[in-house]
């Protein structure tokens, strides 16, 4: 059995509630307020869906995010659909650890997250691809922001 840890804390449904903002535009929650997360509208691709630059605690992140389906995991982790600045594709799923001020890219785009047998499973309902299972957040390549 695998236990997912984030900063030494076991991840499970009891201590890692998942919540999603359908759209970040004009939205806020306790986590966004606590970490001073600001979203600035930047552009909109031909297919719709606004794209935003993001700052956390006054620090601008080196990528933009789609405003849709911003997923909060526990009290300090966020999963977003990111793109390079001034673009709208390719889309890459990014985890942002707000407490430790780091982020990790997954090199692919995943639309959905769920806990499954004490692991995280990421899937994509838009594009047919393999699911990704994460056993430990510590195994991701984290970059400071």
Task: Mark where each language-model region is.
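Secretory-pathway ectodomains
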Residues: 2, 66, 79-89, 121-123, ...
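Terminal domain-start segments
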Residues: 1-62, 144
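Repeated scaffold domains used in trafficking and secretory/extracellular systems
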Residues: 6-32, 63-76, 81, 106-123
């Amino acid at each position: 059995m695998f236990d997912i840890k984030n900063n030494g804390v076991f991840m499970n449904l009891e201590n890692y509630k998942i919540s999603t903002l359908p759209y970040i535009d004009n939205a806020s929650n306790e986590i966004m307020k606590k970490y001073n997360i600001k979203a600035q509208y930047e552009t909109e691709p031909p297919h719709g869906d606004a794209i935003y630059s993001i700052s956390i605690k006054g620090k601008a992140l080196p990528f933009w995010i789609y405003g849709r389906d911003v997923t909060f995991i526990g009290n300090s982790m966020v999963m977003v659909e990111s793109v390079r600045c001034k673009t709208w594709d390719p889309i890459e799923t990014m985890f942002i650890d707000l407490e430790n001020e780091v982020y990790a890219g997954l090199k692919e785009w995943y639309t959905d997250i769920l806990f499954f047998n004490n692991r995280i499973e990421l899937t994509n309902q838009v594009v047919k691809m393999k699911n990704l299972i994460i056993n430990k957040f510590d195994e991701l390549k984290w970059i400071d922001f």
